[in-house]
Design a protein with these regions (language model features):
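Sec-dependent signal peptide cleavage junction
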Residues: 21-40
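Beta-propeller domains
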Residues: 69, 74-105, 113-154, 320-342
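Structural signature of eukaryotic scaffold interfaces centered on beta-propeller domains
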Residues: 104-119, 157-175, 219-240, 299-312, ...
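Loop/turn-rich, solvent-exposed surfaces of beta-rich toroidal or solenoidal domains
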Residues: 286-337
Length: 376
């Protein structure tokens, strides 16, 4: 990816921002199986993890690849039709998006999967095979110029990069532990990472949460984990775990971040730095959870490219592959009761057939999102 853009613009009751190519774009939308695990396993994985499941649109690099797969597997095509999201939003705004930042000087052209916009720096994460690269870019007006990076080994593919401070130290929540069963190498765990310029670190070297199939109030498994992501509320008090299993079912779980950080502190200095979501302490930190399956899943453009959580517990989901117009869904509610409040379709001249949505961030009154221009 050579251009990433962020767009930032108020448009009535809806606002947008975005990232395109090696540019960053952002948008802000304001619209009014089931088996309990008895013991902790010796490894940081569930026995079913890595079991291949259905392939969906996000498992392919291009729409053409996905279409060819469906043509070769007609039985899969009918299954995917049944699973396609059919839930309807209460509102369908079309906010105008505005270019906000352009990322310059990145040493590699891989797509930026997620950005974090701070006051001085923009951090961007790119995947290369099983590994990821986390780069720090200095903000200078409407540009952000590459400064340094760290290599994240075996972290896999994720859209999680949530900055926070804990005990006076700056960290990121990130997706980690690549799922090698899938071409996209989806991440299957959520970890706490300290940025260290010039360093190479393996996912086993950071404290993290494993067994995310059990990340819920009941302590029951959703099944074999395919991919996970997370979203931190703006005030840092709550974190949302988003988990998809290999059948496509999705689990949303809300946690008290102070309690989760306390659990990670316990393993920080140990050789095995994972905390299973099956422990009583992690279960107690879960405040609510719910699931979506089949055509009831909220997947804009039948795609998931990132999630965010507001202080008011609203959930924002961005979706769209190349050839899709970016869409942002907003779910409102609390606990396990949510409604599909809005589906926004941001408007911008650069949203052509080669634009792919990448990541989302809430910042002030705006929602920032990335657009990867695959033609660059």
């Amino acid at each position: 990816m050579k251009i990433k853009k962020f767009i930032n613009k108020v448009a009535g009751a809806t606002m947008c921002a975005m990232i395109i190519g090696t540019t960053v774009v952002s948008v802000n939308v304001k619209a009014n199986a089931e088996t309990s695990m008895k013991t902790t396993e010796a490894l940081d994985t569930h026995v079913d993890d890595g079991v291949a499941g259905i392939l969906e649109k996000d498992d392919f690099d291009t729409q053409d690849e996905y279409q060819k797969y469906l043509e070769k597997h007609p039985q899969i095509q009918s299954q995917e039709v049944n699973m396609a999201s059919r839930v309807s939003a209460n509102k369908n705004p079309k906010p105008k998006a505005t270019l906000r930042y352009k990322i310059k000087g990145l040493p590699r052209t891989a797509a930026i999967q997620k950005t974090y916009i701070g006051s001085t720096y923009i951090y961007v994460i790119q995947r290369s095979g099983l590994d990821s690269y986390l780069s720090r870019c200095v903000i200078n007006g409407s540009n952000a110029v590459y400064k340094d990076e760290m290599k994240l080994q075996n972290f896999g593919h994720g859209q999680t990069l949530e900055w926070f401070e804990y005990n006076g130290i700056a960290y990121f929540w990130v997706t980690c532990k690549a799922n090698e069963t899938y071409k996209e190498k989806w991440g299957t765990q959520i970890g706490r990472l300290k940025y260290q310029a010039g360093q190479t670190i393996d996912y086993t070297q950071i404290p993290r949460f494993s067994h995310l199939s059990y990340a819920n109030k009941s302590g029951s498994s959703i099944g074999s984990v395919k991919r996970v992501d997370a979203a931190l509320s703006s005030n840092g008090k709550k974190i949302l775990f988003w988990v998809m299993d290999n059948t496509g079912e999705i689990q949303y779980s809300f946690y008290n971040t102070s309690k989760l950080n306390a659990e990670l502190d316990k393993v920080q200095s140990q050789s095995s730095k994972y905390v299973p979501c099956t422990t009583s302490e992690v279960k107690a930190a879960c405040t609510a959870s719910f699931r979506q399956s089949g055509s009831n899943r909220v997947l804009p453009n039948n795609s998931f490219q990132g999630v965010e959580l507001s202080d008011a517990d609203s959930i924002y989901i961005i979706g769209g592959k190349a050839q899709d117009k970016p869409q942002i869904a907003k779910l409102t509610g609390s606990g396990s009761n949510y409604k599909y409040e809005a589906l926004a379709t941001p408007v911008h001249d650069n949203f052509g057939n080669s634009a792919e949505s990448e990541g989302i961030q809430l910042k002030g009154d705006y929602v920032y999102f990335g657009i990867n221009d695959t033609s660059k």
